[in-house]
């Protein structure tokens, strides 16, 4: 029997972001109770030696599995120390990988109070408008002019601590181009 390879997308991340993600998930599972039904699996409960944690998030019949890894091959740069995240959507026996934006949007649809597009219609009809969205990471588009005006009128309050965002977990602060300064501090190099 020959070896068969299975390829999956693993987002390379900083280990401190993984620690922050895990603590936010646990806080909202056990303290604030906003993550009802979420399941956290520790590294010692996994059969795979590279898995450091798993978070199972029910989405109706389906579920989202956010798996963090350690001990992977290091990246091109010295600071890529072999930590990563994979995001998988599962429904019965079917599974596919999703990107962090879609994962945040799916979580937003199923959990957390939202101040959304329907707020415009409710405000025009004179109904009570919920003044905040608890999960801003789930909004990935620019709102309409009426929505932006209503949002400016009703200032949202910030949830402390913030809700766990898959996009925040996977964003890489090192891959942004550095701004270097030329002679006397003028921005002449790497101007994009």
Curated annotation (Swiss-Prot):
Domain notes: The BC-like-box motif mediates the interaction with elongin BC complex.
Function (record text): Counteracts the innate antiviral activity of host APOBEC3F and APOBEC3G by promoting their ubiquitination and degradation. Acts as a substrate recognition component of an E3 ubiquitin-protein ligase complex: mechanistically, Vif hijacks a host cullin-5-RING E3 ubiquitin-protein ligase complex (ECS complex) and the transcription coactivator CBFB/CBF-beta to form an active E3 ubiquitin-protein ligase complex that targets APOBEC3G and APOBEC3F for polyubiquitination, leading to their degradation by the proteasome.
Region of interest called Interaction with host APOBEC3F, as start-end residue ranges on this chain: 14-17, 74-79
Assembly notes: Homomultimer; in vitro and presumably in vivo. Interacts with viral RNA and Pr55Gag precursor; these interactions mediate Vif incorporation into the virion. Interacts with the viral reverse transcriptase. Forms cullin-5-RING E3 ubiquitin-protein ligase complex (ECS complex) by interacting with host CUL5, RBX2, elongin BC complex (ELOB and ELOC) and CBFB/CBF-beta. Within the ECS complex, Vif interacts directly with host CUL5, ELOC and APOBEC (APOBEC3F and APOBEC3G) substrates.
Compositionally skewed regions (Basic residues) per UniProt: 176-192
Residues recorded as bearing Phosphoserine in the entry: 144, 165
Ranges for region RNA-binding: 75-114
BP-aspect Gene Ontology terms: viral life cycle
Extent of motif HCCH motif: 108-139
Superkingdom, taxonomy of origin: Viruses
Record key words, sorted: AIDS, Host cell membrane, Host cytoplasm, Host membrane, Host-virus interaction, Membrane, Metal-binding, Phosphoprotein, RNA-binding, Ubl conjugation, Ubl conjugation pathway, Virion, Zinc
Keyword presence, Calcium: no
More about this protein: Vif-defective viruses show catastrophic failure in reverse transcription due to APOBEC-induced mutations that initiate a DNA base repair pathway and compromise the structural integrity of the ssDNA. In the absence of Vif, the virion is morphologically abnormal.
Lineage, highest ranks first: Viruses, Riboviria, Pararnavirae, Artverviricota, Revtraviricetes
Region (Membrane association): 171-172
Official protein name in the record: Virion infectivity factor
Motif window: BC-box-like motif: 144-153
Posttranslational mods: Processed in virion by the viral protease.
Chain ranges passing through the membrane: none
Region (Disordered): 159-192
Region (Multimerization): 151-164
PTM-bearing positions, type Phosphothreonine: 96, 155, 188
Site (Cleavage in virion (by viral protease)): 150-151
Entry membrane topology: Peripheral membrane protein
Region entry Interaction with host APOBEC3F and APOBEC3G, spans: 54-72
Stimuli inducing this protein: Expressed late during infection in a Rev-dependent manner.
Region Interaction with host APOBEC3G, residue ranges: 40-44
